[in-house]
């Protein structure tokens, strides 16, 4: 058994290992998000209609509890799983979790438009509306006084999944 020791240099933000090794991971294929049972129609509404992600083909045997969406032409996807066996405690923990995917938006104009769109849906409420969105025009996304972070905002979909949008 071989043990690999890693280090992280905060100044250069480079990770070093004690031996050279070929890169084994070439990218990220998908991120899976959970939603309550019987709500895949809301996932299609939010992720396809609001965010503009293109639905992908799901295996026929899984259509009742899965929805997949392409993220542009990147080859990456968002998978949505409707789990009938999730307890209310598990669903509550999900809605309070800081874990999140971060979506890259091509321009500041489109980022601002998307934030206004999600904010309007949040404000309107109702079934399928986001349960949270950073208010447009406020520095509530943690930009920091020094501008340490790129322009971004956070929202939570109708099921409480935390989502980040950035340049």
Protein language model annotation of sequence segments:
Residues 2-44, 101:
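N-terminal beta-strand motif that seeds the catalytic metal site of vicinal oxygen chelate
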Residues 13-15, 64, 85-90, 138-143:
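A short, acidic/glycine-rich surface segment
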Residues 22-25, 33-78, 82-83:
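Core segments of cupin and vicinal oxygen chelate
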Residues 35-41, 101-159:
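Vicinal oxygen chelate
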Residues 80-83, 87-105:
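Helix-adjacent hinge/juxtasegments
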